[in-house]
Swiss-Prot record:
Family: Belongs to the ATPase alpha/beta chains family.
SMART domains the record matches: AAA
Keyword Transmembrane: no
Organism of this sequence: Polynucleobacter asymbioticus (strain DSM 18221 / CIP 109841 / QLW-P1DMWA-1)
Protein keywords: ATP synthesis, ATP-binding, Cell membrane, CF(1), Hydrogen ion transport, Ion transport, Membrane, Nucleotide-binding, Translocase, Transport
Catalytic activity annotation: ATP + H2O + 4 H(+)(in) = ADP + phosphate + 5 H(+)(out)
InterPro entries to which the protein is assigned, alphabetical: AAA+_ATPase (IPR003593), ATP-synt_VA_C (IPR055190), ATP_synth_F1_bsu (IPR005722), ATPase_a/bsu_AS (IPR020003), ATPase_alpha/beta_chains (IPR050053), ATPase_F1/V1/A1_a/bsu_N (IPR004100), ATPase_F1/V1/A1_a/bsu_N_sf (IPR036121), ATPase_F1/V1/A1_a/bsu_nucl-bd (IPR000194)
Subunit structure: F-type ATPases have 2 components, CF(1) - the catalytic core - and CF(0) - the membrane proton channel. CF(1) has five subunits: alpha(3), beta(3), gamma(1), delta(1), epsilon(1). CF(0) has three main subunits: a(1), b(2) and c(9-12). The alpha and beta chains form an alternating ring which encloses part of the gamma chain. CF(1) is attached to CF(0) by a central stalk formed by the gamma and epsilon chains, while a peripheral stalk is formed by the delta and b chains.
Topology of the protein relative to the lipid bilayer: Peripheral membrane protein
Protein name as catalogued: ATP synthase subunit beta
Gene name in the database record: atpD
Pfam families: ATP-synt_ab (PF00006), ATP-synt_ab_N (PF02874), ATP-synt_VA_C (PF22919)
Gene3D superfamilies, alphabetized: 2.40.10.170, Bovine Mitochondrial F1-atpase, Atp Synthase Beta Chain, Chain D, domain 3, P-loop containing nucleotide triphosphate hydrolases
Any one GO CC term of the record: plasma membrane
Domain of life where this protein originates: Bacteria
Length: 466
């Protein structure tokens, strides 16, 4: 272990000079040595080495506010990467990027710690799975089903409901699921983290969830590493042979923190100002989120889409790593249909007759074909009106509008502001309902009957009252 001194501070990026023969390695953790002088710098502030500049100088990034730092302050090398507590003691607790508790419930009682930088599992250790994970959300179960041990991305612009969808998935899966969950809040609003904590507490599943937060107000170092902290805790449970749910809100902020750090480290930006190492950073994180022969990790990640542009480098790089993509659309949200999932844009590798079965596959494809036909006819309807359509097209449009409304569903987590109780719809019911609409059994019912209901029987009941 060696000590060095700060020679330059540029925001969260700090240059520290060590003796030439005792330079710390890349990703080693450094800590600020407490001196007797008065300073308002955070006590024991941690840094992570990012670059070795030469001549004993390393460039590090502060894992906390760099206020109060100045040249000449002493810094100690720990000789190992940042490590965080793992294991059962983390359950029910809220931690920061360094694994320190931030819930005022005392220290975390575990000796077991693990470095946040780990290699991804080897190719022969991976275990693909084809078991479906039922979510109880009609549109997801029908057109973009999730796999146990798979990776799911929720893509959407600002304010179309990524976090609400994620909370509903947590509500439906984590509460039904007997295993453990890890939630990583990466650069999101503190209020959402707070809501999540209380939601878990009220439903008595808090002792099955470990929470790690590095929110919007934190320096970029925290936001860049907090996803790895959460992932390390999830990996530790997986390696014990458990089935884990890993939630990340929001992957885009992880990329954004990387962009901030990259610019401060003096790297040349690449497309749209992102860091040149974007694909590698994303790969390092995503390749570790995987199921092995010992245990599974099912991950659900919210991905913010800047300016609703799915071709932006950040969401585009994320797409490559996912099994299912749930795309939330502003146009559908504008119609008042929630969850605002676009059934034509969302995809899943699981939607294959050999995995979901022939009936499910055919119903899903019928639904998509009907909606696609309606999409093509919209321009004609806008110019000439419905009367100019052929009888077959009129029928297709009327069915498509019923399908569109039947894809909406009241959420448990939105009960507070919608006033209608949430519905969990089993997969069999979902398939039966859409099959009835597509086959024409319900052509006589008004389309309003299908809006914001659970199963098809509720729609039929609602039609009687209209």
């Amino acid at each position: 272990m060696s000590n060095g001194n700060i020679v330059q501070c540029i925001g969260p990026v700090v240059d520290i000079q060590f003796p030439r023969d005792k330079m710390p390695n890349i990703y080693d953790a450094l800590t600020l040595v407490e001196s007797g002088e008065k300073s308002f710098a955070e006590k024991g502030l941690t840094f992570e080495v990012q670059q070795q500049i030469g001549d004993g100088v390393v460039r590090a990034i502060a894992m906390g506010a760099s206020d109060g730092l100045r040249r000449g302050m002493e810094v100690k090398s720990t000789g190992k990467p940042i490590s965080v507590p793992v294991g059962p003691a983390t359950l029910g607790r809220i931690m920061d990027v360094l694994g320190r508790p931030i819930d005022d419930a005392g220290p975390i009682a575990t000796e077991e710690r693990r470095a946040i930088h780990q290699p991804a599992p080897k190719f022969d250790e991976l275990s693909p799975s084809v078991d479906l994970l039922e979510t109880g959300i009609k549109v997801i179960d029908l057109v973009c089903p999730f796999a146990k041990g798979g990776k799911v991305g929720l893509f959407g612009g600002a304010g179309v409901g990524k976090t609400v969808n994620m909370m509903e998935l947590i509500n439906n899966i984590a509460k039904q699921h007997s295993g453990l969950s890890v939630f990583a809040g990466v650069g999101e609003r503190t209020r959402e983290g707070n809501d999540f904590y209380h939601e878990m507490k009220e439903s008595n599943v808090i002792d099955k969830v470990a929470m790690v937060f590095g929110q919007m107000n934190e320096p970029p170092g925290n936001r860049l590493r907090v996803a790895l902290t959460g992932l390390t805790m999830a990996e530790a449970f997986r390696d014990e042979g458990r089935d884990i749910l890993f939630f990340v809100d929001n992957i885009y902020r992880y990329t954004l923190a990387g962009t901030e750090v990259s610019a401060l480290l003096g790297r040349m930006p690449s497309a749209v100002g992102y860091q040149p190492t974007l694909a590698e950073e994303m790969g390092k994180l995503q390749e570790r989120i995987t199921s092995t022969k010992t245990g599974s990790v099912t991950s659900i990640q919210a991905v913010y889409v800047p300016a609703d542009d799915l071709t932006d480098p950040s969401p585009a790089t994320t797409f490559l790593h996912l099994d299912s993509t749930v795309v939330l659309s502003r146009d559908i949200a504008a119609l008042g249909i929630y969850p605002a999932v676009d059934p034509l844009d969302s995809t899943s590798r699981q939607l294959d007759p050999q995995v979901v079965g022939q009936e499910h596959y055919e119903v899903a494809r019928d639904v998509q074909m009907t909606l696609q036909r309606y999409k093509e006819l919209r321009d004609i309807i806008a110019i000439l009106g419905m009367d100019e359509l052929s009888p077959e097209d009129k029928l297709a449009v009327s069915r498509a509008r019923k399908i569109q409304r039947f894809l909406s569903q009241p959420f448990h987590v939105a009960e507070v502001f919608t006033g209608s109780p949430g519905k969990y719809v089993p997969l069999k019911e979902t398939i039966r309902g859409f099959k009835m609409i597509c086959s024409g059994e319900l052509d006589h019912l008004p389309e309003q009957a299908f809006y914001m209901v659970g199963s098809i029987d509720e729609a039929i009941e609602k039609a009687k009252k209209l």
